[in-house]
From Swiss-Prot:
It comes from Pseudoalteromonas translucida (strain TAC 125). Its EC number is 3.4.21.92. This is ATP-dependent Clp protease proteolytic subunit. It catalyses: Hydrolysis of proteins to small peptides in the presence of ATP and magnesium. alpha-casein is the usual test substrate. In the absence of ATP, only oligopeptides shorter than five residues are hydrolyzed (such as succinyl-Leu-Tyr-|-NHMec, and Leu-Tyr-Leu-|-Tyr-Trp, in which cleavage of the -Tyr-|-Leu- and -Tyr-|-Trp bonds also occurs). Fourteen ClpP subunits assemble into 2 heptameric rings which stack back to back to give a disk-like structure with a central cavity, resembling the structure of eukaryotic proteasomes. The lineage of its organism: Bacteria, Pseudomonadati, Pseudomonadota, Gammaproteobacteria, Alteromonadales. PANTHER family: ATP-DEPENDENT CLP PROTEASE PROTEOLYTIC SUBUNIT (PTHR10381:SF70). Its main location: cytoplasm. The active site is at S107 (nucleophile), H132. GO terms for cellular component: cytoplasm; endopeptidase Clp complex.
Length: 205
């Protein structure tokens, strides 16, 4: 069973056939890579995807609590609550979670990228990173707008403080830099402290 992605194009996911003592066994490619402790965070961050990633992390912890997990990120961002569920689980489990940006890590994707274990956060050379403040949209009674505005400001402050902790940047710098969309190359993400290094090939690891 493929538990790596939630995209409707799942039908196009290639299968891998392995020879075992009991005969042939087939896996979809994501389930096969899960055996190598590789998890993919692809597409918008939302509740269903977050639940699948949480389940995979907890499963891999039960398999071996002392071996690293590798989280490959290619995401435009998405739900803060779904992202924080992934973030909290990354910190809750015993294995280190190494994060690798392929393509893009924007918004909550960038936040999860920098939340990887120190020294184990990477970008591929042509990937892009984007940080900004959380977006809010609300429809309802006028009396509720103030409540939701306060909640958005509280979330913004929490995310900025955590980003400052993970990057080593001063809080006022993070607050200023996330006020608008802030795009970075892989090398700029290293300089900023979002990742630790750029992988050009496996030999550079």
């Amino acid at each position: 069973m493929n538990i790596g992605i939630t995209d409707p194009l799942n039908a196009l996911v290639p299968m891998v056939v392995e020879q075992t003592p009991k005969g042939e066994r087939s896996y979809d490619i994501y389930s096969r890579l899960l055996k190598e402790r590789i998890i993919f965070l692809t597409g918008p961050v939302e509740d269903n995807m977050a639940n699948l990633i949480l389940a995979q992390m907890l499963f891999l912890e039960s398999e071996n609590p002392d071996k690293d997990i590798f989280l490959y990120i290619n995401s435009p961002g998405g739900s803060v609550t779904a992202g924080m569920a992934i973030y909290d689980t990354m910190n809750f489990i015993k294995p280190d979670v190494s994060t690798i940006c392929v393509g893009q890590a924007a918004s909550m994707g960038a936040f999860l990228l920098t939340a990887g274990a120190k020294g184990k956060r990477f970008c591929l050379p042509n990937s892009r990173v984007m940080i900004h403040q959380p977006l809010g949209g609300f429809q309802g009674q006028a009396s509720d707008f103030e409540i939701h505005a306060k909640e958005i400001l509280s979330i913004k402050d929490k995310l900025n403080r955590l980003m400052a902790e993970h990057t080593g940047q001063p809080l006022d710098v993070i607050s200023k830099d996330t006020d608008r969309d802030n795009f970075m190359s892989a090398d700029q993400a290293v300089d900023y402290g979002i990742v630790d290094s750029v992988f050009k090939n496996r030999a550079s690891k």
